[in-house]
Design a protein with these regions (language model features):
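Glycine/proline-enriched, intrinsically flexible loops and inter-domain linkers
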Residues: 1-340
Length: 340
């Protein structure tokens, strides 16, 4: 995603990293960012066809990640960018977070027939459709022009509200199971919560009109959570969401029949057995040949150093040893330090 739309791709890198532990009801306290790029000082005319210039990717991605982290109020304690020609084909964008919560506040139970599933947070749009497959498929020179919609659009303030809400013990203890909306959207985030499900796509809040059932089912719009609660706790949970100015609606129920059923405009558009879904697709095998590592020319091999001054100056001229102070200072590393 960062190769195609650097700002949004890097922002959702951090947003997704925060949502993963958040679905486990843990609060994220710290983040780190390690990236890899080719030489951003290369002239524009040396850019590979069908790719953005490295300088554009490097600067916009840093803006995207830091913008999301600074808005949500997450301390980014370590930032490092590595430069190597191997990253000219595909950039490396790694975001990692550290999260924790009191064990007594985290409830993990099975979904029972009759339980209600609430969709919490952001609205659903066309952004992110195909993002899961897009990050793994083979891209071509045309990807930069036609795959922009696969990149999700983050909304840090909304995710901050979910963080604040889930941090409250009285809220966290109402949640039996929870999934964040990542790859696959409604069909996966809700589809994984129980063996039998009846999902009403008409109830899914939309960013705008015109979305069909397929788009509602697979959109990967950001800042959404699927929460399983007992029927008697639904009104209480919706009340807590309203206090945080979060949109929350009931969109599905757990059923006894082990089937995933999605309805749209009064019609059933998906009806799949859980046994089929649990096969995870066709069984695949492949043959692998491992090559023995070449021990010659390794970084640990002792070499004769000729002109020490020349080697020293060459090393100092490397992008990997230059100061990254300007990059690091884009990220707030102390936010929350004085919060009790």
């Amino acid at each position: 995603p960062t190769e195609i739309e650097p700002f949004g791709g890097a922002a959702t890198c951090l947003g997704g990293a925060i949502r993963d532990p958040l679905s486990g009801r843990t609060y994220v306290y710290q983040a780190m960012r390690i990236t890899g790029a080719a030489d951003p000082t290369k002239p524009l005319n040396q850019t590979l066809k069908g790719k953005l210039p490295q300088r554009k990717i490097v600067t916009e991605a840093a803006h995207g990640y830091s913008s999301y982290g600074n808005q949500i109020g997450l301390a980014t304690g370590y930032v490092k960018e590595l430069y190597h020609p191997g990253y000219v084909a595909k950039r490396m964008e790694i975001g990692a977070v550290m999260a924790a919560a009191p064990r007594k506040n985290v409830i993990r139970e099975t979904s029972d027939p009759g339980d209600v599933i609430i969709l919490l947070g952001g609205r659903t749009g066309r952004d992110g459709i195909g993002g899961a497959t897009g990050s793994s498929k083979v891209h071509t020179e045309a990807s930069i022009e036609v795959c922009g919609a696969e990149v999700q659009k983050g909304n840090a303030p909304t995710e901050r509200k979910i963080q604040r809400m889930f941090r409250r013990p009285e809220v966290s203890r109402l949640i039996k199971k929870c999934n964040d909306f990542g790859a696959g959207g409604v069909s996966v985030a809700i589809g994984e919560l129980a063996d039998g499900l009846l999902i009403d796509l008409d109830k899914v809040p939309k960013k705008y009109a015109g979305l069909d059932g397929t788009e509602l089912a697979i959109s990967e719009s950001q800042e959404r959570m699927a929460v399983v609660v007992d029927p008697k706790d639904v009104d209480t949970f919706l009340g807590y969401a309203k206090e945080e100015n979060l949109e929350a609606v009931t969109v599905a129920t757990v059923t006894e029949s082990p089937r995933l059923v999605l309805t749209w405009r009064g019609k059933t558009i998906v009806d799949l057995s859980r046994a089929f879904l649990d096969t995870n697709g066709a069984h695949q095998e492949t043959d692998v040949t491992l090559e023995v590592p070449n021990h010659e020319g390794t970084p640990f091999e002792k070499k004769e150093v000729g002109d020490v001054k020349e080697k020293w100056l060459k090393m100092l001229g490397s992008l990997n040893v230059c100061s990254q102070k300007g990059l690091v200072e884009m990220f707030d590393s102390s936010i929350g330090a004085s919060t009790v």
